[in-house]
Amino acid sequence: GKEELRSQYRSRGAGENCFGVSPANLNKLKKKIGVDPVLALALWNFKNTDGQILAAMIADPQEMTEPQLNAWVRDIDYYLVGEAFVSNVVSKNVFTKALMLEWIASKEEYVKQCGYLAMASLAQQDPTIPDGEFTDQLYAIAHELQNAPSRAREATRSAWA
């Protein structure tokens, strides 16, 4: 990684365990590795920001169980990890809808963020879901937007769009 990018990530909330690997280099690694659930789990468990983002990129979303997804979401402590997790794993998993509702109800900032990102993903990717199905969540967004943690608040903007 690069020190400049590492400093940038850390100033935005990434913890000390961050190398500062660029998204372009992570994408190159993803292409080189392909899907590798065993490596993804090892990288995720290392608790390194860059490793968790890459883990989300190389995980097999269809193989992940609901308990595994719940375990991973509770490990998230940086918004870019949450975004990578939802876009690469959660949005392509059969449990997306059920987890979305559970995570939106969470008090944990990054869990809630992932819930709203999952909702935005479902709304954009699945035209068979009637708009009315998101009504309760949209009312919740309107009600709690002012008091929601910052990353959850940002994710609600994606869900609202």
Question: Where are each of the predicted segments found?
Answer:
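Alpha-helical scaffold domains
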Residues: 1-161
